[in-house]
Design a protein with these regions (language model features):
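Short, surface-exposed terminal/edge motifs of secreted or surface/virion proteins that either
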Residues: 24-34, 38
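Low-complexity intrinsically disordered segments
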Residues: 42-77
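Intrinsic disorder/low-complexity segments
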Residues: 18-19, 31, 43, 49
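Short, surface-exposed beta-edge/turn micro-motifs
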Residues: 12-16, 22-25
Length: 77
């Protein structure tokens, strides 16, 4: 399963997904921007949730293939 598949199966509240420098997956309810600390995305005081690695293993989620800064994806409507 790809990250985009998981996002589209999640609650419609979650609009975006991205990974950080360590490969952790996050869902956001609004479009985030890259943090000044250069390790992940910021949620601009909106809500974000980290997807636990155990959940990743359960659903066999493929890691993002590429630079984490290019990992931001939007939910399909």
């Amino acid at each position: 399963m790809k990250i985009k598949d998981l996002l589209n199966l999640s609650d419609p509240f979650w609009k975006y997904a991205a990974t950080d420098k360590n490969g952790e997956i996050y869902f956001y309810n609004a479009k985030p921007r890259i943090c000044n600390n250069s390790w992940g995305f910021a949620d601009k005081n909106d809500i974000a949730i980290r997807i636990d690695n155990k959940f990743n293993e359960l659903f066999d989620i493929e890691p993002f293939d590429g630079d984490w800064k290019d990992s931001l994806i939007e939910r399909e409507e």
